[in-house]
Amino acid sequence: QWYRPDYQAVIVVGDIDVDAVENKIKTLMSDIPVPAADAARKETITVPDNEDPIISIYTDPEMQGSKIQLFVKRPALPAQMNNLIYGEMFDVIQAYMTTMENARLQEISMKPDAPFLGAGMGSGEIGVIPTLNATTFVAMTQDGKLAEGFEAIYTEMEKVRRYGFTQGEFERAQNDLMRRAERAYANRNDRRNGEFVQTYLNNYSKNTPMPDAETEWQLDSMLIKMINVEAVNGFAQQVIYPRNQVIVVTAPEKEGIVNPTAEELLAIREKVANAEIEAYEDNTVKEPLIPEGTVLKGSPVKKTAQDATLGTTEWTLANGVKVVVKPTTYKADEVRMSAVAKGGLSILSDEEFYMGEMMPAFNSMSGVG
């Protein structure tokens, strides 16, 4: 019913002898029998609607970290539409929505009193069911703080449903999406084989398009510029609603940790739904980090050294800082920088070393940083 030739495809990408590989595949697979005409076919799975939220709470003594997920289910876009411009436009609108909402959630997570350690929003496929999509909110919280985290993400979801996004948020998201598209096009000749495989696999299994890089760039840049904030807000209202919700909690089962019950989660949901919620206030400063015309005070170069083997240039500055520069052609329009200072684990005693090595993990789990 499932594993049979008419449901299978072989995708090969790489520096190969095409004829030899094709003949090898035919030799290996041609003996697989074709199913009988009356053989059972796989069923199309349809997930039923639900008016009241479905809530699942999973706790385990070995569970690491507390997490709550909120799914708002919806039918998937019909497969025959995935290969049309409408399908690509649908994806771009989703990208706008998730980019703007994730920026809001990140802004909250950076506050000293943030109700979660981290949170995110997604939109699209859910699990392995091709007929089902969902808008998803997820929050990771300190142990025992799931109720606060759930109230926060439900409030943010309700805020988007009621008020949508601002023009300022949209413009920043547009710049971000354009940069992503430009970067993908600039690196079109450096794509890995796995990227091609995934594109062809999606075309076979989901009927998504597989355009060349030039066509993809032209289409995506056109759609990114064509879509406006009203279209995104309209889409958000269509995919965020009180029915078809699923809430999933995963948390440690330990003494002293109190996790919310299903009844408590429903009460939080009801509280937020009936609350007066203010629209998002966009206070982002549009000024550049370094104003144009600013003269930066640097440190003069005292020594220059070349390493022909590594292809690097090392500058030693008057203040003692060493700068190593290596030009590459790996990726177009990309500059990577990192800075390292002496200290850290190297200044700890042998007895303190292992505790110091574990400290970042403890900090992360405790909500620091």
Model-identified regions with their sequence ranges:
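M16/insulysin-pitrilysin zinc metalloprotease superfamily fold
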Residues: 22, 108, 126-186, 208-209, ...
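M16/MPP (pitrilysin/insulinase) zinc-metallopeptidase core fold and M16-derived inactive scaffolds
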Residues: 99-133, 338, 342-369
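A conserved hydrophobic secondary-structure block that centers on an alpha-helix together
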Residues: 1-8, 19, 365
